[in-house]
Amino acid sequence: MPELPEVETVKRGLKNRLKDFYIHDVEVITPRSISSEGGSKAFVKNIIGLKSGEWTRRGKYLICSLHSSDREEIAGWWVVHLRMTGQFQWFQKKTKSCKHTRVRIWNKDGAEIRFVDTRNFGQMWWISPTFLPTEKITGLKKLGPEPFSKEFNPFYLQESLKKRKRSIKSSLLDQSIVAGAGNIYADESLFQAGILPTKESKKLNKTEIKKICTSLTHILKISIGEGGTSFKDFRDLEGVNGKYGGQAWVYGRENKPCRKCGVKILKAKVAGRGTHWCPNCQK
């Protein structure tokens, strides 16, 4: 699943390509991709004729304000979650639909933003301007603070973890604790912090918690700079792979030597997810 760096990369691409993008026509090929009230028919009816405004990211959600003509007031919201394999593709000219295309959106000049999703778990919503997206999408409402926000700090994390018996890996995957982190960057940040992913959350001391906060934000910043990670399906709008995977410390490196100490990287299921760590560097 695309995590914070990948979704941030997509957001930046959408912000660049869809600046003042007037929605002239929409084709929903797979109705189940639309999760908002009224389904695909209401989605198409409500967004045609509107202009895309500011794109933002909240956790793994993409949020776009929509506007009528040149008016500044918001005429609705377009929200997207890529889930496992969702991706946007940009086409400057009219192009035939490709396999796994779910939604196609054009401007009057024929430029297209296309939503392609192999597993078909991705979701889109149209939200009326009378509501905020958080009022209609439960997942958005439950999100914890962003890793780069002031709210995400060692004191906050210590308070959030002090009664949790679950592993620290499980806690970092919990979107109500920190928004946007996922399997890849939980493994990577725990390696950099020198902490075993199986360690019980409430047993972490202040120094360890501070290391986790620092490591997570550091790893996320590096990955954003590399355009994210492309181990499987992720591409940006132009079809370019993310480059972080080539420098990953542990993720995807089972049985390979640790980049720090040379000991073989281990992999096992933790919190139901394939988890990588160095048995020597992490305690």
From Swiss-Prot:
Annotated function: Involved in base excision repair of DNA damaged by oxidation or by mutagenic agents. Acts as a DNA glycosylase that recognizes and removes damaged bases. Has a preference for oxidized purines, such as 7,8-dihydro-8-oxoguanine (8-oxoG). Has AP (apurinic/apyrimidinic) lyase activity and introduces nicks in the DNA strand. Cleaves the DNA backbone by beta-delta elimination to generate a single-strand break at the site of the removed base with both 3'- and 5'-phosphates.
Cofactor(s) named in the record: Zn(2+)
Taxonomic source organism: Prochlorococcus marinus (strain SARG / CCMP1375 / SS120)
CDD domains with a match to the protein in the record: EcFpg-like_N
Pfam families named in the record: Fapy_DNA_glyco, H2TH, zf-FPG_IleRS
Family the entry assigns: Belongs to the FPG family.
Gene Ontology terms for molecular function: 8-oxo-7,8-dihydroguanine DNA N-glycosylase activity; class I DNA-(apurinic or apyrimidinic site) endonuclease activity; damaged DNA binding; zinc ion binding
EC number(s) given by UniProt: 3.2.2.23, 4.2.99.18
Subunit note: Monomer.
Record text on cofactor binding: Binds 1 zinc ion per subunit.
Reaction catalyzed: Hydrolysis of DNA containing ring-opened 7-methylguanine residues, releasing 2,6-diamino-4-hydroxy-5-(N-methyl)formamidopyrimidine; 2'-deoxyribonucleotide-(2'-deoxyribose 5'-phosphate)-2'-deoxyribonucleotide-DNA = a 3'-end 2'-deoxyribonucleotide-(2,3-dehydro-2,3-deoxyribose 5'-phosphate)-DNA + a 5'-end 5'-phospho-2'-deoxyribonucleoside-DNA + H(+)
UniProt cross-references to PANTHER family, sorted A to Z: FORMAMIDOPYRIMIDINE-DNA GLYCOSYLASE (PTHR22993:SF9)
Keyword terms: DNA damage, DNA repair, DNA-binding, Glycosidase, Hydrolase, Lyase, Metal-binding, Multifunctional enzyme, Zinc, Zinc-finger
HAMAP family per UniProt: Fapy_DNA_glycosyl
Record keyword rRNA processing present: no
Zinc finger (FPG-type): 249-283
Presence of the UniProt keyword S-adenosyl-L-methionine in the record: no
Lineage: Bacteria, Bacillati, Cyanobacteriota, Cyanophyceae, Synechococcales
Domain of life according to the entry: Bacteria
Biological process annotations from GO: base-excision repair
Protein name: Formamidopyrimidine-DNA glycosylase
SMART domains attached to this UniProt entry: Fapy_DNA_glyco, H2TH
Active-site residues annotated for this sequence: 2-3, 60, 273
